[in-house]
A protein has these predicted regions:
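Beta-strand cores of secreted/periplasmic/IMS beta-sandwich domains, seen most often
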Residues: 1-28, 62-91, 121-141, 186-202, ...
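Alpha-helix initiation/capping motif
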Residues: 9, 18, 176-177, 181, ...
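Active-site pocket scaffolds in enzymes
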Residues: 98-110, 197-318
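Histidine- and aromatic-rich segments of cupredoxin/plastocyanin-like copper-binding domains
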Residues: 30, 37-185, 190-191, 255-258, ...
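Low-complexity, flexible helical/coil segments
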Residues: 20-28, 44, 111-115, 277, ...
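Short, solvent-exposed loop/turn elements at domain surfaces
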Residues: 35-40, 86, 207-211, 241
């Protein structure tokens, strides 16, 4: 089971974006499962990697549709799958306009034809439903007939259907249709210099992070509130990585600049090779209850790919 908190503040409430819950603003929780002949979920932990199912569920429903108002529609996306990453697109080729990521709004909307969504990652998109008829969001190619037959005899990692959601516009187009704002937030300005660089390798054949499995009695990293660090994350196999209690910016992915849709504040990132993060420690932890950083692939975290982070309060000036 998975749920979603929608956290608003004065900035988000003032944004000229759809905000009528259930009319033009919808939470979308995506999961892959494996169901038996009676529709009951089956789970067999893999020896390596993470669990991959063959049935796509959205808000607990297979191949759902929703009636939406004509105009802009806002979808708040969450990948709540154990390990599967999705590449989302619209069936008629119209763009997805990305407006927010894990921890807040992007500086400006980013129009994309395809949008990746890693386990644990959150994104917000808006879609123009003012013209045309219904449109579907899909997540890649569905299993062919031979794949489906093979799936009757052995577990399959190929999705039976890649239909995420169908949007069906209803009603009349408003007399006035707002355009998307050109800007959402001012550009991110780094206040302060990087005080330290750390490197972490997420293993699988050798479980753990940097060859060490999680130990609740051990602190793996210490930092000070209000400082910046450079974290370089390597992965032996593609997986998502999450850090609690921080906000970070993706500086580069395998040596290339981050995609425009990944330039907002984040706490979860897909690692396929190496990524470089600029990590800002904005929250104080407790020595008794440290923050965690870990593989967002559920089974890999269970096998020990996690570490503990203590963030100490900034010194007071007296």
């Amino acid at each position: 089971l998975a749920g979603m908190w929608l956290v608003e503040d004065e900035v988000s409430k003032a944004m000229p974006l759809p905000s009528h819950y259930g009319v033009d603003d919808f939470p979308i929780i995506i999961q892959d499962k494996r169901l038996d002949n009676f529709g009951v979920p089956e789970y067999d932990p893999p020896a390596k990697g993470g669990f991959i199912g063959d049935t796509l569920l959205v808000n607990g429903v297979q191949s759902p549709f929703v009636e939406v108002s004509r105009g802009w529609v806002r979808l708040r996306l969450l990948n709540a799958s154990n390990a599967r990453r999705y590449t989302l697109q619209l069936s008629d080729g119209r763009p997805l306009h990305v407006v927010a990521s894990d921890q807040g709004f992007l500086p400006a909307p980013v129009a994309v034809q395809q949008l990746s969504l890693a386990p644990g990652e959150r994104r917000e998109v808006v879609i123009d439903m003012s013209q045309g008829s219904e449109v579907s969001i899909t997540a890649g190619e569905s299993a062919g007939i031979m794949d489906r037959l093979r799936g009757l005899f052995e577990p399959s990692s190929i999705l039976i259907s890649t239909l995420v959601l169908t949007l069906k516009p209803t009603g009349l187009l408003p007399l006035v249709t707002d355009n998307l704002p050109m800007r959402l937030l001012s550009d991110q300005i780094l206040d302060g210099s990087v005080v330290r660089t750390r490197e972490f390798r997420l293993g699988d054949d050798l479980p753990g992070i940097n060859g060490v499995i999680w130990d609740m009695s051990r602190v793996d990293a210490q930092a000070q509130q209000g400082t910046w660090e450079r974290w370089i994350i390597h992965a032996d196999m593609p997986q998502a990585f999450h850090i609690q209690g921080v906000s970070f910016l993706v500086k580069n992915v395998n040596g290339a600049p981050a995609m425009a849709e990944d330039r907002g504040w984040k706490d979860t990132v897909w690692v396929d090779g190496s990524v470089e993060l600029l990590v800002y420690f904005n929250q104080v932890s407790s020595e008794h209850f440290p923050f965690l950083f870990y593989s967002q692939s559920l089974e890999m975290a269970d096998r020990g790919s996690a570490g503990q982070l203590v963030t100490q309060a900034a010194p007071t000036l007296g």
